[in-house]
Curated annotation (Swiss-Prot):
Assembly and oligomerization: Part of the 30S ribosomal subunit.
Gene Ontology BP terms: translation
SMART domains in alphabetical order: Ribosomal_S10
Function: Involved in the binding of tRNA to the ribosomes.
InterPro entries linked to this entry: Ribosomal_uS10, Ribosomal_uS10_CS, Ribosomal_uS10_dom, Ribosomal_uS10_dom_sf
PANTHER family the UniProt entry points to: 30S RIBOSOMAL PROTEIN S10 FAMILY MEMBER
GO MF annotation terms: structural constituent of ribosome; tRNA binding
Family listed: Belongs to the universal ribosomal protein uS10 family.
Record keyword Ribosomal protein present: yes
Species of origin: Campylobacter hominis (strain ATCC BAA-381 / DSM 21671 / CCUG 45161 / LMG 19568 / NCTC 13146 / CH001A)
Keyword entries, A-Z: Ribonucleoprotein, Ribosomal protein
Name of the protein: Small ribosomal subunit protein uS10
Keyword Ribosomal protein: yes
Top-level taxon in the UniProt lineage: Bacteria
Name of the gene: rpsJ
Length: 103
């Protein structure tokens, strides 16, 4: 039995929440205990570019990207739990980081 920590990141929070719900459902079917999902702080990356290619430095445009995150802890994971997680079909726009913790 071990503890597994999943960190999920995505640009769209709706896709992220659907993915988290699918993971929680799959883990609970195997009998493991789930802690979370814990919402992580949203990271905002802002980019400022000039509108004009030559002059008018005062005229600028600003763009931003928001990266939403969730964290799940799976307590007392069994080999069946790990197998169900590997077979799970997740959205391609969600980045999943898996870390096996100690007991």
């Amino acid at each position: 039995m071990q503890k597994i920590r999943l960190k999920l990141k995505a640009y769209d929070h709706r896709v992220l929440d659907r993915t988290v719900a699918a993971i929680v459902e799959a883990v609970k079917r195997t009998g493991a205990d789930v802690r979370g999902p814990v919402p992580m702080p949203t990271k905002v990356k802002r980019y400022t570019v000039l509108k004009s290619p030559h002059i008018n430095k005062d005229s600028r445009e600003q763009f931003e990207m928001k990266i939403h995150g969730r964290m799940l802890d799976i307590v007392a994971a069994t080999p069946e739990t790990v197998d169900s997680l590997t077979k799970l079909d997740l959205a391609p726009e969600v980045n999943v980081e898996v870390r096996a913790m100690g007991k």
